[in-house]
Amino acid sequence: AARRTTFEWVLRNTVMNNPNVEIRTGLGVTGVKKSEAAIPKVTGLYYDSGLDEEFDCIIAANGRRSNAPEWLRDVGIEVPDEVVEDTGIIYYSRFYRLPDGIELPVGDRLVAGDLGYLKYGVFWGDNGTFSITFATSDTDKTFWGIKDVELFESVVDAIPAAKEWISLGATPLTGVHSMAGLLNRKRTLRKGDEVVVDGFHMIGD
């Protein structure tokens, strides 16, 4: 296991060492080019620099906040409306590191639980790091104060499965991070059994 930042750093370095891949930074996409056909085909991109470029296939991998559906609609491709569902959850996380020489107490199953009013999980990473995460309803004000470090640690102390990791001498690496406004989105480029566009794909994050 690895922290997301570590994973992305390793992935980027791996990609940069691939001679068949070109990474361009600071270049924004403003729209797509298409060819006229029974099923429209996306053939290229427009950039915020005013330039454009042709491609055989385009994958919009910029996640749930992507403007890709708008790019398609702007050139007359009717994209089905996305389905959006609010998770109604707030996450609170804090990251820790164990002392050198202390092994993470990793077992063969996740360290997680659902108490009904509170979910928790311990997620281990690289180099002796791990995080403890709590999830609560975004309408339950009982745990809103858990963003306070002392309150967070008092909740950790009350959950044996989480406390075990802290008791190994873990040192906090961060304060308490919160994340809310979590929306699940479902997008499709099909209407019934028919695809609405060729040469273009969207994936989430």
For each predicted feature, which ranges?
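Predominantly flavin-linked oxidoreductase catalytic cores and closely associated redox partners
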Residues: N17-A161
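Conserved acidic functional residues
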Residues: A60, G204-D205
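Conserved short hydrophobic patches within well-ordered secondary structure
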Residues: T6, V42, L72, M202-G204
